[in-house]
Swiss-Prot record:
Active site per database record: 8 (proton acceptor), 129 (proton donor)
Catalytically driven reaction(s): 1-(5-phospho-beta-D-ribosyl)-5-[(5-phospho-beta-D-ribosylamino)methylideneamino]imidazole-4-carboxamide = 5-[(5-phospho-1-deoxy-D-ribulos-1-ylimino)methylamino]-1-(5-phospho-beta-D-ribosyl)imidazole-4-carboxamide
Compartments (UniProt record): Cytoplasm
Matches recorded under InterPro entries: Aldolase_TIM, His_biosynth, HisA_bact_arch, Isoase_HisA-like, Isoase_HisA-like_bact, RibuloseP-bd_barrel
SUPFAM superfamilies from the UniProt entry: Ribulose-phoshate binding barrel
NCBIfam families registered for this protein in UniProt: 1-(5-phosphoribosyl)-5-[(5-phosphoribosylamino)methylideneamino]imidazole-4-carboxamide isomerase
Pathway in which this enzyme or protein is active: Amino-acid biosynthesis; L-histidine biosynthesis; L-histidine from 5-phospho-alpha-D-ribose 1-diphosphate: step 4/9
EC number: 5.3.1.16
Gene that this sequence comes from: hisA
Taxonomic source organism: Clostridium botulinum (strain Hall / ATCC 3502 / NCTC 13319 / Type A)
GO BP annotations, alphabetical order: L-histidine biosynthetic process
Broad class of enzyme this protein falls into: isomerase
GO molecular function, one term: 1-(5-phosphoribosyl)-5-[(5-phosphoribosylamino)methylideneamino]imidazole-4-carboxamide isomerase activity
Domain of life: Bacteria
Name this polypeptide is given: 1-(5-phosphoribosyl)-5-[(5-phosphoribosylamino)methylideneamino] imidazole-4-carboxamide isomerase
């Protein structure tokens, strides 16, 4: 299982939200490039970045910082937040992003997902952010009536290979992930599932690994010191090729 440390960008700084609430944001680092380098030094093989300004406005706002991170760390980066059209996807993949995450756009525009998957295959991921099992969009400000499992199955039919699942009620809380919903999703589809939201300690990561999930995104637990990234990667990868 791969562990993806998270960088959430707002106005060029690393911040963390609580339950997806932009008003409850806290700056955790002034220099995202320094943070990314530290993640790499601690053994990260992949980094998860969200452009929170982009998620709110519908267009990428922190591209210069993101480009600098890619050039500096030289390990794969996946990016979400404000990606709403194929031109933006083209631009990001051209800039060196390894995997582009579509969230709101995937729910509002199935045609875009089809086009993107046809062109970029596994470089496209779908971010499914759920509240009470319903898919949320527009920076988590709006909750749809669509069930997260139904949506995941629909994305899989289109050809999506990677799904990032976040239970919003758990995100940034350090109260543990929603293992029940995660397991239900992982058993319902054949895509690579990446767990996100609420992971508080190494035991949570072990619980996710037992489900044979592809990956886990860890944010607040690293910044708060609850999880030592280097130790976590070693423990999770011990005796396992996945």
């Amino acid at each position: 299982m791969i562990i993806l440390p998270a960088i959430d960008l707002k106005e060029g700084k690393c911040i963390r939200l609580y339950q997806g609430d932009f008003k409850a944001s806290k700056v955790v680092a002034e220099d995202p490039i320094e943070v990314a380098l530290k993640f790499k030094e601690n053994g990260a093989e992949y980094i998860h970045i969200v452009d929170l300004d982009g998620a709110l406005t519908g267009e990428i706002k922190n591209l210069s910082i993101i480009s600098s991170i890619i050039k500096t760390i030289n390990i794969p980066v996946e990016l979400g937040g404000g990606i709403r059209n194929l031109n933006t996807i083209d631009m990001l993949i051209g800039a060196g992003i390894e995997r582009v995450i579509l969230g709101t756009a995937a729910l509002n525009n199935r045609g875009l997902v089809e086009e993107a998957v046809k062109k970029y295959d596994e470089k496209i991921a779908i971010g499914i952010d759920a509240k009470n099992e319903k898919v949320a969009i527009n920076g988590w400000l709006n909750v749809s009536s669509i069930n997260y499992i139904d949506f995941a199955k629909e994305m899989e039919k289109i050809g999506v290979r990677n799904i990032i699942f976040t239970d919003i009620s758990k995100d940034g809380t350090l109260k543990g992930p929603n293992l029940k919903q995660l397991e239900k999703l992982n058993e319902s589809i054949n895509c690579n599932v990446i767990a996100s939201g609420g992971i508080k300690d190494i035991e949570d990561l072990k619980g996710i690994k037992e489900m044979d999930v592809y990956g886990a995104i860890v944010g607040k637990a690293i910044y708060s010191g609850n999880i030592n990234l280097n130790e976590a990667i070693k423990i999770i990868n011990k005796g396992s090729s996945k």
